[in-house]
């Protein structure tokens, strides 16, 4: 009995051959749109393209598209918004694509813009540092995000699968919701930060936050260094948490399930750190009144009697604290 695979191949072979002969199969195309109308906001809706927003060399706005003829593409201005849309072509042969990857490149004059909205199904997103937006909302299914622009208001990034990298001069409230992937934030100023990840690592270096930092991670490691904020709340379930030079002016809370909590030159007015299985090992910048608890493990903390409360607990693990 012939396999199902061989039967499908025999059925599709003449179809593909006919499509190629008639020029109906999906090949590549290149389009360029010059945008002469003025606009403030930018909205991009793509199905299977990488998206790049880059500064133009001539001060003009152009949109370049390289992709499959199986896709329809258009760029126009409507009600003060530059709308860029990629949709599937209505063709019986649109599923026959020989283009490996599609790409949308938006060349913008450097300067300030209103809202930036990007909705992508499959593809990477890169936004250069030469722009300032009032707000940014990125929603991706599969693809990496590299965001370097300044945002005066809120920035929201939702993704199912992919890595997220940010290096911004300034951002308002930053919210990241990611199912699978890593988050990296470097040299940024934010009014608040909220990160929620199911599986992946978090790495933050050089963050100044006016308000609260909240990080929730199910599986993965959290590493933070040179971070200042008002309140910090870090919750992990499986994986170590490493903090270096992280200072909260108010509350400093860390909760872990399985994994060590390690910190150096950190501080907060009030500190609460707990882990179920793992050590708590750290160095603080100021005296604290310590309360400690471990079921299985050793405890060694300074015998100071001034400062805020430092509550440390682990079920299985050691507690070792020094004061710098």
Regions found by a protein language model. Give the residues of each.
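Acidic (Asp/Glu) and glycine-rich low-complexity loops/linkers
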Residues: 2-12, 16-120, 124-140, 144-159, ...
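Short N-terminal helix-initiation segments at or just after the protein's N-terminus
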Residues: 262-264
